[in-house]
C-alpha cells in the first residue's frame, strides 16, 4: 500500500488470510500506520521507509495515519 502525502493507495484492500501487507512511504512527509483497534502500529516512517503486518485472521481492519488522519488519510483492509 502506497503512503502518499494525503492518502493511502489503495484506500481499501481485500486479501485472503495469511497475507503480509506492506505499506511504503512514497510521499515527501513523515507518515504512520495505526489500526483503530490497536492491533498494529508503526513507528514514524520517513519517505522511502516501509512497515509490514501479517493478517492471519479474517476481519475488517480500519487504520489511519496519525499525522494526517484528520485530513482523510485513512484506509481499510478486509481479510477473508
Regions found by a protein language model. Give the residues of each.
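Extracytoplasmic copper-binding redox domains, predominantly the cupredoxin/blue-copper superfamily
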Residues: 1-80
Amino acid at each position: 500500500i502506497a503512503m502518499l502525502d494525503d492518502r493511502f493507495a489503495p484506500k481499501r484492500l481485500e486479501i485472503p488470510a495469511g497475507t503480509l501487507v506492506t505499506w511504503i512511504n512514497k510521499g515527501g512527509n513523515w507518515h504512520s500506520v495505526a489500526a483503530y483497534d490497536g492491533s498494529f502500529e508503526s513507528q514514524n516512517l520517513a519517505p522511502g521507509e516501509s512497515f509490514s503486518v501479517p493478517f492471519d485472521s479474517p476481519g475488517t481492519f480500519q487504520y489511519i495515519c496519525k499525522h494526517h488522519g484528520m485530513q482523510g488519510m485513512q484506509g481499510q483492509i478486509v481479510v477473508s
